[in-house]
């Protein structure tokens, strides 16, 4: 019988006198008794002492609780040897007594032992039936409120479902609008492309034969002149008799020579490359560009708002810094481009010369060299009625632009120039592998009362650009 007694003693020693269950985090009081930490904390609910031991009633002025780790191991061992039996419904799990009361402060069911423990002395403790009736009334009010909330939630859910369906319909409608509009635009652009190509071909068929006819006529005249020159050169080598024989006929043919110049054919193309709506699209990428006075040639005069520049007749006394262009009559924009798409417009008015474009930030600004792509410049130069660049020879313009749009796509290596007035393409550089930092470049080239003015973006997206 020794083994059962030992097992029973182990259970008794490992059981808390308050909750009558195995110890959980046991602590020891000053009087030497052990309790679960949570049990003694609840039992000593008052904030100030003295504190009475629940077992021997000895008073202690302070909460001196020492962890009892050996007892915790013993309780764990007892728990493994004799697991606590399941607590029947309606029975207190701590004291294994019937639940007969309800604490309104902690909202807990209590047994008689719970009430005697002193933990709930200052709480609102009521019999089960009375507490149940009061809580039932509260629950019914809560149910009424929750049912109203449920009705509102169902209404909101129905509205949300309708909104989702409506939104999907709106998105689908707009999707069809986008597809339809772009398909229409593609057809219009394709038709416009065919019309431009057809007009260009007609213009080629109209002018090219006249140019070839003039070239052929000049070839015939050149051949006739070559024969006559050869004949006269041979006659000059003859003795006197041979030289003078039939000289009258030879001199007559010389006098009859009249060089007929070719027909003057205008070299301006009547067909211009103008894509409907292109400039409006490019303006989505417009930026607010201003001039950098530290880079301006001493002969250039900048406006106070740094948007206009013109060339003066006298040099200004300005610091000769490495950033300043000299002798080239150039000035850079403040903006620096290392990626992305950018568009800006410049009002040139009736100026007879100007240069616009971009350059690398590290270009040589002190040498009077060619502003070519090889030197880090990509610019369009306008001279009277012609424009050129380092990539293309002089080309005539039928209608010189009064406002020029510049579009840069850094990653695509694209730089193009447009007449911002009618949207016609002025020039496009071949694909450029840009690297490093690029900056806008402006040059008036010559003196003129008309300044070059950077247009200021107006309003929000989709608005036009206006000069200052």
UniProtKB/Swiss-Prot annotation:
A zinc finger (B box-type) spans 87-128. The coiled-coil domain and the B30.2 domain are both necessary for interaction with HN and PAX6. They are also involved in MED15-binding. This is E3 ubiquitin-protein ligase TRIM11. InterPro entries: B30.2/SPRY, B30.2/SPRY_sf, Butyrophylin_SPRY, ConA-like_dom_sf, PRY, SPRY_dom, TRIM/RBCC, Znf_B-box. PROSITE patterns: B302_SPRY (PS50188), ZF_BBOX (PS50119), ZF_RING_1 (PS00518), ZF_RING_2 (PS50089). Ubiquitous. Binds cytoplasmic tail of integrin alpha-1. Interacts with the HN peptide. Interacts with PHOX2B. Interacts (when autoubiquitinated) with SQSTM1/p62; promoting AIM2 recruitment to autophagosomes. Interacts with AIM2; promoting its autophagy-dependent degradation. A zinc finger (RING-type) spans 16-57.
